[in-house]
Each structure stands twice: as C-alpha cells, then as structure tokens.
Amino acid sequence: MNNIYDIVIIGSGPTGISCAIEAKKNHFSTLILEKGMLTNSIYHFPTNMTFFSTSLKLEIGDIPFVSHNEKPTRMEALEYYRRVIEHWELEIKFREEATSIGNQGNGFTVSTINGTYDCNHVIVATGFYDNYRKLNVLGEDLPKVKHYYDDVHPYIQQKVMVV
C-alpha cells in the first residue's frame, strides 16, 4: 500500500522547492516528483548564462544565496538549489515523470512512469521552459533545428535564422 502524502508537488524547480519548504514548515508530508533532475529547466539553460535577477531575489527557504557577482550564474544557481534541498531534507523522486492525476475519494492519485502516489493535495509546478511553441513549418523537426538557445560557438560564421 502506498503512503498517503498531504501534498505531492510536480516539478523540482524553485517554485516546487519553495512550496515543499513551506509545506514542511507547516508539518505537511510532502513528495516532489521530477521528470528529470533537480531544477531541470535551469540545468538546460545556456552553460554560461547569467540571471537577470540578483541572488537576493532568487533566495528561497531562508538559505542565503551568495554569488561572486551581483547577478548569479547558472552554475551558482544549480549549486544553490542543491544546498537548499539538502538543508531542508526534501523528499524528491528524480526521473519520475508524472503521467496523470486522478480523483481518489477526497484526494488524488498521481500516476508516474514508476507507480502511483496518493495524496490530499497536488501542486503542479512544472514551469514553462519545456513548453516551447512549434510553428508547424516545413523543416522545424530537422536535427539541425534548435528550439532553445544553448551556445553561440557552433554558429560562428554560419548563416542562421532566429524566429
């Protein structure tokens, strides 16, 4: 028989982590389900990316976010969020994609690729980065086509089109 969680959170980005911390502070049993790795979207940001926000504005869970510059880098953010989940001892199941949410009595059942989890409440904190919009034009599924910016180096002295 499955444990029944007070809250199941889908997504381990900053919003999902923040929700889990607040739930833990209020003594709710909480599970985070993540289809990829911790802060999966941030991991897929361009390698040398710098955030627009200051580290102070990105802090969560009462854990200071110390950066070498006024605005943190992607790598600093990845390290920071690792420290946050370790400090708060959050229960996270990585590489376990939620596939459906169903009603179950007074609560919900969240189905994943590995099983099911019963809970009283569900928070969907999946973000928007994975939800790019295709244009349905010829060639957009070719291997050379990118739907996200990743790095400029491979495109130096090349003809490119940005839409």
Question: Language-model features: where?
Answer:
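Short amphipathic alpha-helical segments
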Residues: 20-22, 43-44, 134-138
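Conserved beta-strand segments of alpha/beta enzyme cores
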Residues: 29, 91-93, 144
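Feature captures the FAD/FMN-dependent oxidoreductase FAD-binding
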Residues: 73-131
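Glycine-rich dinucleotide-binding loop and its adjacent helix/turn
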Residues: 127-163
